[in-house]
């Protein structure tokens, strides 16, 4: 499984996948690669707040395992995206500090406007306007140019697994690259609604930010732990790298697996 080769190619050709054009070009690339490997692949549209365009390789309804990742890349406002899935107190502390910075960035200009104008209308308009601007920048603002970890790494993990299974083309495995994870897990939400049985019964292995770290972290929900008790050991043997298991119920990992009952989050 040559993940590094995929990483070099995808990062060189499609480092940012945020605009409609960028995402369309990347979808065409993946569909072509899947077809070259001999897979049946398609773009599947769904509606969940907005139109989402997922890349589906194989049959979601017949598969016993879905291997997934999101292919869209985030915006940036200069604040770090800190992931501490196994350390809830530190995770909440970091999130609180980031929220504090955002509050300061909103309220200092608002205070200046209030002092200069003395107008309640101008003050409230500034407050609301800055808040809306901050939310826009977080969701649809300046594209982050550095996306190797989030989530070119996960995308390339899926592509590498597709390549490794290409000779067998097992019917029980399907691959999905989700759209609009960065806008609120929307692509995964739409797919789960369109494939309700799969959302309840199919094991989902979702790779998000797997590019940094010496070990694989698998966050497994209770339903998946009960149905697949040997999941961790199987992952260790097949991957050849250290695997750390965590209980999803005790961790923080907001990614596409949240829309699936047997959704396993995988990061590094």
What do these predicted ranges mean?
Residues 1-25, 31-33, 37, 139-145, ...:
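N-terminal capping segment at the start of a domain
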Residues 64, 175, 204, 263-265:
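Conserved beta-strand scaffold positions in the cores of enzyme catalytic domains, especially
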Residues 108-229, 249-252, 256-258:
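Acidic/histidine-rich catalytic neighborhood of metal-dependent amide-processing enzymes
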Residues 64-70:
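Short beta-strand element of the alpha/beta-hydrolase
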Residues 38-45, 237-248:
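Short secondary-structure junctions
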Residues 15-62, 78-111:
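A non-catalytic alpha/beta surface segment that caps or lines the substrate-entry region
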Residues 70-84, 186:
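Non-transmembrane, extramembrane segments of multi-pass ion/lipid transporters
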Residues 75, 247-268:
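Zn-dependent metallopeptidase/amidohydrolase metal-coordination segment
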């Amino acid at each position: 499984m040559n993940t590094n080769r995929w990483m070099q190619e995808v990062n060189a050709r499609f480092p940012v996948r945020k605009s409609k054009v960028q995402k369309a070009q990347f979808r065409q690339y993946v569909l072509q690669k899947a077809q070259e490997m001999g897979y049946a692949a398609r773009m599947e549209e769904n509606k969940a707040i907005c139109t989402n365009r997922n890349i589906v390789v194989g049959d979601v309804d017949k598969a016993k395992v879905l291997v997934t990742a999101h292919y869209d890349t985030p915006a940036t406002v200069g604040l770090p995206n800190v992931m501490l899935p196994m350390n809830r107190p530190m995770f909440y502390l970091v999130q609180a500090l980031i929220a504090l910075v955002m509050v300061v960035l909103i309220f200092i200009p608002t205070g200046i406007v209030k002092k200069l104008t003395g107008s309640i209308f101008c003050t409230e308009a500034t407050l609301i306007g800055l808040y809306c601007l901050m939310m826009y920048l977080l969701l649809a603002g300046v594209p982050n140019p550095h996306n190797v970890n989030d989530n070119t790494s996960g995308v390339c993990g899926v592509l590498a697994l597709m390549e490794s299974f290409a000779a067998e083309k097992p019917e029980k495995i399907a691959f999905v690259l989700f759209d609009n994870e960065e806008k609120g897990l929307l692509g995964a939400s739409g797919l789960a609604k369109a494939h309700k049985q799969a959302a309840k019964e199919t094991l989902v292995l979702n790779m998000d930010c797997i590019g940094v770290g010496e070990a694989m972290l698998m966050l497994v929900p209770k339903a998946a732990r009960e149905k697949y008790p040997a999941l961790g050991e199987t992952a260790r043997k097949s991957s050849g790298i250290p695997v750390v298991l965590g209980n999803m119920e005790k961790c923080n990992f907001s990614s596409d697996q949240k829309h699936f009952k047997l959704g396993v989050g995988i990061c590094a």
